[in-house]
């Protein structure tokens, strides 16, 4: 492995941590309806005998600010989808209406909003830990490259500086995502 490969692999690992944070945040409820709230929900489809993501089973739309409309491609999956929503941690009550499901999004209480902000912050910390883990692995690899005489001492220092810059960049990106999500949650 050379220095360039190390930096590319490190950046890829850090990007995965940011993507993890984005995906986790999309599942956190804000006061308004969003397809991202339910699209990654795991649904056990009894007629197929497998577990699938909701976005692979239905069209998810938001016809009103506080309503999600779920229209399954296969009408036989309506009740499986309703059950998955009931069993999720979203605290939502799906209304099965023939071939579709209406999912009203109630307004959040102040206490619930604060709990959701705490949840988002803990998810963000988990993502930051992943970024720092990628940094530690990269720093160890940089030391190994120096020990194997692939890079000079100055090269190692430059590499460590670049790794730290990547770390700072992705931690800042996670912090910005948290700020946006917190604002979304606290907006009534």
From Swiss-Prot:
Query: Is the keyword rRNA-binding in the record?
Result: no
What NCBIfam families does the annotation carry?
Answer: frr (TIGR00496)
InterPro entries membership: Ribosome_recyc_fac (IPR002661), Ribosome_recyc_fac_dom (IPR023584), RRF_sf (IPR036191)
Organism of provenance: Akkermansia muciniphila (strain ATCC BAA-835 / DSM 22959 / JCM 33894 / BCRC 81048 / CCUG 64013 / CIP 107961 / Muc)
User: Which terms in the Gene Ontology molecular function aspect does this entry carry?
Assistant: ribosomal large subunit binding
Q: What is this protein called?
A: Ribosome-recycling factor
Keywords, A to Z, come to: Cytoplasm, Protein biosynthesis
Q: Looking at the UniProt record for this protein, which Gene Ontology cellular component terms does it annotate, in alphabetical order? A: cytoplasm
Q: Which PANTHER family match?
A: MITOCHONDRIAL RIBOSOME RECYCLING FACTOR PSEUDO 1, RIBOSOME RECYCLING FACTOR
What is its biological role?
Responsible for the release of ribosomes from messenger RNA at the termination of protein biosynthesis. May increase the efficiency of translation by recycling ribosomes from one round of translation to another.
- UniProt xrefs under CDD domains: RRF
Subcellular location field: Cytoplasm
Q: Which Pfam families match?
A: RRF
**SUPFAM superfamilies to which the protein is assigned, alphabetical:** Ribosome recycling factor, RRF
The record's Gene Ontology biological-process terms are: translational termination
Domain of life assignment? Bacteria
Name the predominant localization. cytoplasm
The record's comment on protein family reads:
Belongs to the RRF family.
């Amino acid at each position: 492995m050379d220095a360039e490969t190390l930096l590319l692999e490190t950046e890829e690992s850090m990007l995965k941590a940011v993507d993890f944070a984005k995906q986790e945040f999309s599942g956190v409820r804000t006061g308004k309806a969003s397809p991202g709230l339910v699209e990654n929900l795991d649904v056990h489809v009894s007629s197929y005998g497998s577990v699938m993501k909701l976005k692979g089973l239905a069209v998810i739309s938001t016809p009103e600010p506080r309503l999600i409309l779920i229209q399954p491609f296969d009408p036989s999956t309506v009740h499986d989808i309703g059950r998955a929503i009931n069993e999720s941690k979203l605290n939502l009550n799906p209304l099965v209406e023939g071939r579709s499901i209406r999912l009203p999004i109630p307004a959040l209480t102040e206490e619930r909003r604060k709990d959701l902000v705490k949840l988002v912050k803990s998810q963000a910390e988990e993502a930051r830990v992943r970024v720092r883990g990628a940094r530690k692995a990269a720093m160890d690899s940089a030391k190994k490259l120096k020990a194997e005489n692939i890079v000079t001492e100055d090269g190692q220092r430059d590499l460590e500086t670049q790794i730290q810059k990547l770390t700072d960049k992705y931690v800042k990106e996670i912090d910005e995502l948290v700020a946006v999500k917190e604002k979304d949650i606290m907006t009534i």
